[in-house]
Amino acid sequence: MAAIRKKLVIVGDGACGKTCLLIVFSKDQFPEVYVPTVFENYVADIEVDSKQVELALWDTAGQEDYDRLRPLSYPDTDVILMCFSIDSPDSLENIPEKWTPEVKHFCPNVPIILVGNKKDLRNDEHTRRELAKMKQEPVKPEEGRDMANRINAFGYLECSAKTKDGVREVFEMATRAALQARKRGKKSGCLLL
């Protein structure tokens, strides 16, 4: 039986860990150097609930310079990974300010998984000191859960691409969301207006 094909698009602020998450999941290696993304695509095979799924992973650039290009990634999307970084409260703030309106405009009815990246930095002393200088602290798990409820996400997960903690679970949940969206008969898929 042929694998079911699904398209996943990952969005979120620049440098919040999107590309690392995709690379660790698809290639099982952590890139040590930061390279801002233009557009990269990967394909990964995943099995969930005894179903073989071929997941097309569409990376996007979070930087504002790409705001007009990014929508080209959205058509026919089955699931969105909307990311923020646990060491950047500002990136969480941009979830309702920027990312949710953009995604809901181009991808109405497509399930969203909210993902807190860089979980390993929550208790990192250097990170905490740097944030304290700006009167901030790392994002708490309940803040992520509250945001997921607020934007009506399919689910909320935290992970660390660096330690691989929670990475597989993110893509399992995303695959389940993509499969369920089809089952419910919703007209999912993104529109380019």
UniProtKB/Swiss-Prot annotation:
This is Rho-related GTP-binding protein RhoA-C. Regulates a signal transduction pathway linking plasma membrane receptors to the assembly of focal adhesions and actin stress fibers. It holds the Pfam family Ras. GTP binds at residues 12-19, 30-37, 59-63, 117-120, 160-162. Residues 191-193 form a propeptide. InterPro entries: P-loop_NTPase, Small_GTP-bd, Small_GTPase, Small_GTPase_Rho. It is a lipid-anchor. The keyword GTP-binding applies. The gene is rhoac. GO terms for cellular component: cleavage furrow; cytosol; dendritic spine; plasma membrane. It is found in: Cell membrane.
